[in-house]
Amino acid sequence: MNISRFILVRHGETAGNKDGLFYGSTDLPLTEHGHRQAACVAAYLQDIQIDTILISELQRTRQTAEYIRAPETHHYHCDPRLNEMHFGEWEMQHYSEIAARYPADWETWMNDWLHAAPTGGEPFPQFAARVQAVADELCGEASETPATRLIVAHKGVLGLIITRWFGLPAEAMWQFPCEQDSYSVAECRDGFMTLAVFNGRSCFTPVV
């Protein structure tokens, strides 16, 4: 049986997470707590062979990946399609500030976020399409070449990848909230995908 594994890791905490702000494309570093979270995930995955590492362009994913496997020993494949959604003029603002400054756009977003865009930001359909394209490519690679691939990305991105792999609509992404300081594992066995671990917080032992 051919088995491919995807280890999905959300980056550690940033100041934007800590302060409850809308942000995606803003390139924030990890907080001290975020560094500790990344170290915890690295410990959970220390005994797993990892063949390929994929990250976004944003430093918080690279900083997290560096705890899991050092760049001196593993090449990082940086894919801009794995970047978090760009929230335009809403970046680094609290929802209460956004509602006050952009009331019409905020109301549109709240009523139909699946088809709307933040002020000056990325429309959700465009965001979903680029992430789903990566998910499709990875699924095809998994069927052809068995390997263990680590993906360090963002909450929205990882949720969309999971829903794509399991044939769910994009809005189901919120049913798979990948948490910081944890990891998830999707396995492709002879072309059939399963979710083996979700938000795991203990050492991972693969089942052959």
Predicted segment positions?
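Glycine-rich phosphate-binding loop signature in dinucleotide/nucleotide-binding domains
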Residues: 47-49, 138-147
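Phosphate-coordination/substrate-recognition cap region in phosphate-metabolizing enzymes
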Residues: 39-106
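Active-site catalytic microenvironments for nucleophilic, acid-base chemistry
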Residues: 44, 67-71, 137, 141, ...
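Loop-to-helix element that buttresses phosphate recognition and phosphoryl-transfer chemistry
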Residues: 13-68, 118-132
